[in-house]
From Swiss-Prot:
GO biological process: L-leucine biosynthetic process
Alphabetized SUPFAM superfamilies for the sequence: 2-isopropylmalate synthase LeuA, allosteric (dimerisation) domain, Aldolase, post-HMGL domain-like
Keywords annotated in UniProt: Amino-acid biosynthesis, Branched-chain amino acid biosynthesis, Cytoplasm, Leucine biosynthesis, Magnesium, Metal-binding, Transferase
Molecular-function GO term, any one: acetyl-CoA C-acetyltransferase activity
Organism: Marinomonas sp. (strain MWYL1)
Entry's family note: Belongs to the alpha-IPM synthase/homocitrate synthase family. LeuA type 2 subfamily.
Cofactor(s) needed for function: Mg(2+)
Every Pyruvate carboxyltransferase domain range: 31-305
Uppermost EC category: transferase
Quaternary data: Homodimer.
Pathway assigned in UniProt: Amino-acid biosynthesis; L-leucine biosynthesis; L-leucine from 3-methyl-2-oxobutanoate: step 1/4
Name the UniProt record assigns to this protein: 2-isopropylmalate synthase
Summary of the function given for this chain in its UniProt record: Catalyzes the condensation of the acetyl group of acetyl-CoA with 3-methyl-2-oxobutanoate (2-ketoisovalerate) to form 3-carboxy-3-hydroxy-4-methylpentanoate (2-isopropylmalate).
Length: 558
């Protein structure tokens, strides 16, 4: 890299537009959406889609709610031409969906394009030519009048051909390619001339599509360009202002959002930002950004995973794990502090009647797009006490007491430090069961076989039968409750100097016949404090077994 890049690169020009109003506005309504996956996205693929993939993609776009879909560049290849004919002749286009095709401003290409659309109920013909100085002077060797005339003659020819097919509802879309670095006055002049030639009406509307063909400036500058264009245009009756942002500077989404604030009514782009170079604007992120602000985008990504899988299969490109909303890690927290905040957020959400989503680190509810909460918190060496506790709570209904959370997190961290890898839910559950003797079929575990109790002189007396490996013991104890009576019995039988330092219990589920889970921590002169957990349909038996399980480190003394 150059230490003085200014000797090679010049900053893009900005426009002086103090009358801007867009910065104080909010996004309250969705734009019209146009997917260009089958044209702009497809032309950027190393292996362009065949008809089977294109049809699957087309149908999925319709399922997601797209009403305008750019399907081909018919004059570019026989494959594209045939696909348009397949859609029309096969009656694959719903009545409320309009297909769009693209053409350059050349007579032969325009004629081929219109031929591909014969029989369509509705169609958008998208014509473009480059208008920026670097393209006029270097690529096409044209001056401004020649560039303007190319646009006018192309629109004129399209109009003449469309008039031959009155059964189709025609819409013209004109794009001054490279609009974002075209002189504002010249871009306005060319678009005015195109509109004057087309003469838009209610029956024959027009779209002016203003692209950031290559991103060269910050999103606020493009927003100024859009608002300046809109306020300067002579008449926008029956004309829709559309934008087509690219992502060369990584700000395609912000560019589109600010353009909408500035007055754009329509956005073209691709799912997950496919397209030439760094791609087009990502329509999924745009739509979900609106959704997370309480605005229904008129697109449905309720099954985000299915959308990801289809796009990956058709494009032969992966969706990045960190991709907003759609990536495999989009909602995942490994950090202990993040996990703790999320866990507390869910607990707060459950304790209130408010439907407003307020969960730290999660801009929307993953379930709204078909994800599970299992994907939210995952456990590795960076995780704290809340991560594993959350997984056990959400997947097994266990609400671990704080002391047990801390104890188990140490065991988890020791495991992940040793392996150096993420610890999946199945391994977390296995480690928990092994650590706190939640394995009723384990022969190395002391089990409560049966017990009887009765009250005498204000005390509870318990008679219990325990089995450990091949040994069986009969125990007798008394206390103010059955748990303290069992504690007394264990002390007497095994001479253990133990005390219960923590005890919690709750039901698993909301049903009357739900099982109970008990958590017991003991302290002993003979061993470090330890925990036991037990689950049983009998809540009393669960608490007694949990106490017995907590004594596991002392079994060698028995």
């Amino acid at each position: 890299m150059l230490t003085q890049p200014s000797i090679k690169y010049r900053p893009a020009q900005i426009i002086d537009f103090p009358a801007r109003t867009w910065p104080s506005k909010q996004l309250k309504t969705p734009p019209r959406w146009c997917s260009t996956d089958l044209r702009d996205g497809n032309q950027a693929l190393a292996n362009p889609m065949d008809h089977v993939k294109k049809m699957a993609f087309f149908k999925h776009l319709i399922e997601c709610g797209f009403k305008e879909i750019e399907v081909a560049f018919p004059a570019a290849s026989q494959t594209d031409f045939d696909f348009v004919r397949l859609l029309i002749e096969g009656k694959h286009i719903p009545d409320d969906v309009t297909i769009q095709v693209m053409t350059q401003s050349r007579v032969d290409l325009i004629e081929r394009t219109i031929q591909s659309l014969v029989g369509a109920k509705k169609a958008i013909v998208h014509i473009y030519n480059a208008t920026a100085p670097v393209f006029r002077e270097i690529v096409f060797c044209q001056d401004k009048p020649a560039t303007l005339e190319l646009a006018v003659q192309g629109v004129k020819h399209i109009r003449q051909l469309c008039e031959q097919y009155p059964d189709t509802q025609w819409t013209l879309q004109y794009s001054p390619e490279t609009f974002c670095f075209t002189e504002p006055d010249f871009a306005l002049e060319v678009c005015e001339a195109a509109a004057k030639t087309w003469q838009p009406s209610l029956e024959r509307p027009m779209i002016l599509n203003l692209p950031t063909t290559v991103e060269v400036n910050t999103p606020n500058v493009f927003a100024d360009q859009i608002e300046h264009f809109i306020t300067s245009f002579s008449s926008l009756e029956n004309i829709t202002i559309s934008v087509h942002p690219h992502n060369d500077r990584g700000t395609g989404v912000a560019t589109a959002e600010m353009a909408i604030l500035a007055g754009a009514q329509r956005v073209e782009g691709c799912l997950f930002g496919n397209g030439e170079r760094t791609g087009n604007v990502d329509l999924v992120t745009l739509a979900m950004n609106l959704y997370s602000q309480g605005v229904y985008p008129n697109l449905d990504f309720s099954d985000m995973r299915r959308t990801v899988e289809l796009v990956e299969e058709c494009n032969e490109l992966p969706v990045h794990p960190r991709h907003p909303y759609a990536g495999a890690l989009a909602f995942t927290a490994f950090s202990g502090s993040h996990q703790d905040a999320i866990k507390k957020g869910f607990a707060s959400q459950k304790s209130t009647s408010s439907m407003i989503w307020q969960i730290p680190y999660l801009p929307l509810d993953p379930k709204d797009i078909g994800c599970t909460y299992e994907e939210v918190i995952r456990v590795n060496s960076q995780s704290g006490k809340s991560g594993a506790a959350w997984l056990l709570q959400e997947n097994h209904g266990l609400f671990l007491p704080r002391k047990l959370q801390i104890d188990f997190s140490k065991k988890v961290k020791n495991h992940t430090d040793q392996t150096g890898h993420e610890m999946p839910l199945a391994d977390v559950w296995r480690l928990f069961r092994e650590s706190y003797r939640l394995n009723p079929d384990d022969k190395g575990q002391m089990k409560l076989m049966d017990y009887r109790s009765h009250s005498s002189n204000g005390l509870q007396e318990i008679r219990a039968t325990l089995r450990y490996q091949e040994k069986t013991w009969q125990l007798v104890g008394e206390g103010k409750g059955l748990l303290s009576a069992m504690l007394d019995a264990l002390r007497k039988r095994f001479n253990w100097q133990i005390n219960i330092s923590d005890f919690h219990e709750h039901t698993l589920g909301q049903q009357t016949k739900s099982k109970a889970v008990s958590y017991v921590q003991i302290e002993s002169d003979q061993a470090t404090p330890s925990f036991g957990v037990a689950i049983d349909e009998d809540s009393t038996k669960a608490s007694l077994q949990a106490l017995i399980n907590a004594c596991h480190p002392l079994y060698k003394e028995a």
